């Protein structure tokens, strides 16, 4: 059995996850990164995507939004604007949300509103991550 460390996933409104796990894989801005116990301390950005953790030889997945991840030798803290476990997601509702966001993307002028465009593309990435989990992909 592998050594375990604590992982916390926290949003502004709730603690989504607080467990002892064997490994964490998170979506960083430079790509996915993995963490095992004893990892070198770091602070990094998290982009919208799928965060997974290994517990009892099984990976459990969450959809996470933008935020930060602090890695210490014996703890990982993930602070994001939103996070959802698979059982919280409805594929039909998420698919509808994704379609609406894609329509908004077509209508937005990225040059005139770069911040609005960035926020919308971030929401799109989050919706795609949620749909991936909700549909079992």
Region spans (language model):
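Compact, glycine-rich, soluble single-domain proteins
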Residues: 6-95
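Acidic/glycine-rich phosphate/pyrophosphate-binding loops and surrounding catalytic core
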Residues: 87-137
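N-terminal helix initiation/capping motif
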Residues: 1-3
């Amino acid at each position: 059995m592998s050594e375990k460390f604590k992982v916390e996933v926290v949003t502004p409104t709730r603690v989504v996850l607080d467990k002892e796990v064997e490994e964490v894989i998170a979506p960083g801005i430079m790509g996915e990164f993995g963490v095992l116990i004893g990892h070198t301390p770091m602070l990094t950005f998290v982009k919208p995507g799928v965060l997974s953790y290994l517990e009892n030889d099984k990976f459990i997945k969450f959809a996470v939004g933008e935020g930060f991840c602090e890695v210490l030798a014996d703890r990982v803290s993930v602070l994001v604007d939103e996070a959802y476990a698979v059982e919280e997601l409805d594929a039909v509702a998420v698919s509808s949300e994704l379609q609406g966001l894609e329509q908004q993307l077509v209508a937005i002028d990225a040059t005139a509103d770069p911040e609005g465009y960035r926020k919308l593309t971030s929401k799109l990435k989050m919706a795609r991550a949620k749909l991936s989990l909700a549909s079992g992909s």
